[in-house]
């Protein structure tokens, strides 16, 4: 495209359009310092200049997630085979229960890998945001499978408590449960991730909102919840195996441990389920506060008011902002637009920011769409 790039600021009233020419010496939309003329005078300002960094971060996140899931799947398959054989020989419901949950874990790993593949596909005219939410839907499916399998196993545990006509080989159960515990510890270490609220671009530290911490990839987080549930199960099975090994008459410990484990599993899914539903409901992401973002916008010289401020996320870490701002100095709309974008991008981890500048005299206090949202 020849000539300077244009950015258009549209006013709702009379659809008046302001055309602003942006030169190469200006800052880009995510707060990076302006290029000096002697550095690269041919690069024009563009609204997506910093999207390359966001895209690269997303690619690294997905590559890491796929690698972790593939390794976890291989380890999971090996221990599933061992537990099914060991549980069958020992006659232990708890061991077979653990194998069943590992099988569900393996299925969830495959679902997560599929959702990661889908989320990397390009956007279309129908799916303008792309397939990012496939990652969230895949994680939600994993949580639902945990609940379904847990419900079945609770039923079987109750059956064993009511009808205790079964035998358990304590030795085989003890060996198998110890191996299962080791497998789940390894899986938990592989899938565990930690984040911190810094950006290291360009060798500099950019401190984001103090309460915001980058969240784990949804697919990895759901898989980790699966493994933590199995870890609880393995611990409970090992305890029941020790009891049965030394006191065979206390075989009721086997279904009791299965029942106790189920409660722990449901507890471990609550937090991740809440975050997934918040994303699907277009809620404000955890760690980002509406009032803080609004104050960050109002702090820019020339901004008189903010309305239609919306904060939501496509995935755990892809947060989006859109807002309308009013000013009484339209001659500086270009500067105000860039300052607002820079301010929010340097203070919060926004993946995309859309700002509409409007004349302050066109604001309508009676407009139902401009009201401040309730608490």
UniProtKB/Swiss-Prot annotation:
InterPro entries, A to Z: Cation_efflux (IPR002524), Cation_efflux_CTD_sf (IPR036837), Cation_efflux_TMD_sf (IPR027469), CDF/SLC30A (IPR050681)
Name the record gives this protein: Proton-coupled zinc antiporter SLC30A8
Residues noted as binding Zn(2+) 1 in the record, renumbered to the chain: 101, 105, 226, 230
Disulfide bonds: none
Additional remarks: Each subunit of the homodimer independently transports zinc ions in a pH-dependent manner. The cytosolic pH promotes binding of zinc ions to the transporter binding site. Upon change into the organelle-facing conformation, the two histidines of the zinc-binding site get protonated at lumenal lower pH, triggering zinc release into the organelle. The transporter then moves back to the cytosolic-facing conformation where the two histidines get deprotonated at higher pH, resulting in a net antiport of 2 protons.
Membrane topology: Multi-pass membrane protein
Subcellular location: Cytoplasmic vesicle, Secretory vesicle membrane; Cell membrane
GO biological process, one term: zinc ion import into organelle
Oligomeric and partner information: Homodimer.
Residues involved in Zn(2+) 2 binding: 47, 307, 324, 358
Binding-site positions, Zn(2+) 3: 46, 48, 367, 370
Species name: Xenopus laevis (African clawed frog)
GO cellular component: plasma membrane; secretory granule membrane; transport vesicle membrane
Keywords, ordered alphabetically: Antiport, Cell membrane, Cytoplasmic vesicle, Ion transport, Membrane, Metal-binding, Transmembrane, Transmembrane helix, Transport, Zinc, Zinc transport
Ranges that cross the membrane: 69-89, 99-119, 136-156, 171-191, 224-244, 252-272
Reaction catalyzed: Zn(2+)(in) + 2 H(+)(out) = Zn(2+)(out) + 2 H(+)(in)
Cytoplasmic side: 1-68, 120-135, 192-223, 273-375
